[in-house]
C-alpha cells in the first residue's frame, strides 16, 4: 500500500496506515457511508469496522462512493465471539466480505479472546491468510497470557493487537510484550470513549493543545503517532473527522510526550478481556 501519510510496517512487510477512522456505534447506511466518504476525502486511508457493529455494508458503500481505488484504502474488520471456531469463522469472514462488497480484506481480527475457541479461530485466520483473502491477520483485546497460549500452536504470529489504549490507560506492559514479539498495537477508544473518561478535559492536554493551537483530541492522536501506535478515533461528525486527521503539521516535544506519559492511571473504561465475554461465555 502506498501510504499518503505515516504507516507502520507489519512483520509480514505489509504497510498499514497509522491513522484510521473507527465506526463503532455508527448506524449502517447513510451515516456510516457518509463518515467513510468524508474521512477518505479528508485524507484517511484506513477504516476500522467489525461484524458486531452492523455497519460493514455502509463501510463498503462509503469506499465505493469516495471514488478512491479500493487498493488505496485499508479495511479492518473482526470476527465476533459467537462466530468463533474454525468453520464458523471461515463462514463469518465470507459474510463480512460480502457485506463490505470487497474481494479481499486488509486485516481480519479476532475481536475478543473469549474462553475456549480462539486457538481454532486463529487456525481459520491462518487459512484465510494463506489463501490471500486477507493481507494481514491479528487479534483484539488479547493480554500477554492469551498471546502466549496462541504462540504454542500458531504457524503465523499475529501482526496486530487492537486494544483499549489512551492517556489514562497506557497498557505499558502489553505494549512492551507486543514490541518484543513484533506485533503492532492499535488503540481503540484512543480519546477515552466520551465524557465518562474525561480525558479531553485534562488540564495537561489542554495546556499542550493551546501551545500548538490544536485541540486536546489532536494532541492525543499525535501522542499515539509519536509512540508508533496505530490509532482509530471514531466519529460520524464531518468536522471532527477532518480535525482528527489534521495532525501532520505539528510535533510534540519530548517534554510534552513525557507529561502525557505521566497521566497514566491504569484506568480501563471498556471490558476486561479476562472477565468480559460478550456473545456468550461458550466462546
UniProtKB/Swiss-Prot annotation:
InterPro entries, per the entry: AKR, Aldo/ket_reductase_CS, NADP_OxRdtase_dom, NADP_OxRdtase_dom_sf
Residues covered by region (Disordered): 264-283
GO molecular function term, any single one: nucleotide binding
UniProt-listed GO biological process terms: prostaglandin biosynthetic process
Active site per database record: 53 (proton donor)
Location of the protein in the cell: Cytoplasm
Keywords assigned by UniProt, alphabetized: Cytoplasm, Fatty acid biosynthesis, Fatty acid metabolism, Lipid biosynthesis, Lipid metabolism, NADP, Nucleotide-binding, Oxidoreductase, Prostaglandin biosynthesis, Prostaglandin metabolism
Quaternary structure note: Monomer.
Biological role: Catalyzes the NADP-dependent formation of prostaglandin F2-alpha from prostaglandin H2. Also has aldo/ketoreductase activity towards the synthetic substrates 9,10-phenanthrenequinone and p-nitrobenzaldehyde.
Protein name as annotated: 9,11-endoperoxide prostaglandin H2 reductase
Gene source species: Trypanosoma cruzi (strain CL Brener)
